[in-house]
Amino acid sequence: MVHYKLTYFNARGLAEISRQLFHMAGVEFEDERINEEKFSQLKPTFPSGQVPILCIDGAQFSQSTAIARYLARKFGFVGQTAEEELQADEVVDTFKDFIESFRKFVIAVLSGESEEILKNIREEVIKPAVKTYTAYLKAILEKSSSGYLVGNELTWADLVIADNLTTLINAELLDIENDKLLKEFREKIIETPKLKEWLAKRPETRF
């Protein structure tokens, strides 16, 4: 039996989608959560000096998107055709572009910056980025007959976006109660039985 170990901090962050994919597929894995001290000790042993790290029977692999894409493909969450797989990748890459603007806010929060600085980042960087990003998502959902972002089945793109919407809500950067389309999409995904089970028992973290 293959042994999987996923190493990351005690946060959703860059490892959460991989964790969700393991649970959605019903595949056992070791969810190793490390602190900064442990990371400093292990860093020299990691391929790129970064986490998350997926260890498969002792072989290490890095890069969060590569890991999640591998698991999605292996467990059947990439769509039913090559074109659907391409579309799922497109959605995830659009999310990654958006996250670059969001990263500045996360760093400011974790660094303890003043509320004034956080407010400036929200107004000047985050809000315009959120508007463009959510418009892109809603354009896809408006054309969807299934309620999913890609095809007629849940894909890893749905997991990525639903998790990100949760982060935006928690950071008070998205008023989803006034956005019917995104609210219905997020609820559809997080109410998926196996995912709902994981969300109920995972450790509570801010990001």
Curated annotation (Swiss-Prot):
GO molecular function: glutathione transferase activity
Catalysed reactions, semicolon-separated: RX + glutathione = an S-substituted glutathione + a halide anion + H(+)
Task of the protein: Conjugation of reduced glutathione to a wide number of exogenous and endogenous hydrophobic electrophiles.
UniProt entry tagged with the keyword Transferase: yes
Domain GST N-terminal positions: 2-79
Cysteine disulfide links: none
Signal peptide segment: none
Xref: InterPro entries: Glutathione-S-Trfase_C-like (IPR010987), Glutathione-S-Trfase_C_sf (IPR036282), Glutathione_S-Trfase (IPR040079), Glutathione_S-Trfase_N (IPR004045), GST_C (IPR004046), GST_superfamily (IPR050213), Thioredoxin-like_sf (IPR036249)
EC code: 2.5.1.18
This protein's name: Glutathione S-transferase 3
GO biological process, one term: glutathione metabolic process
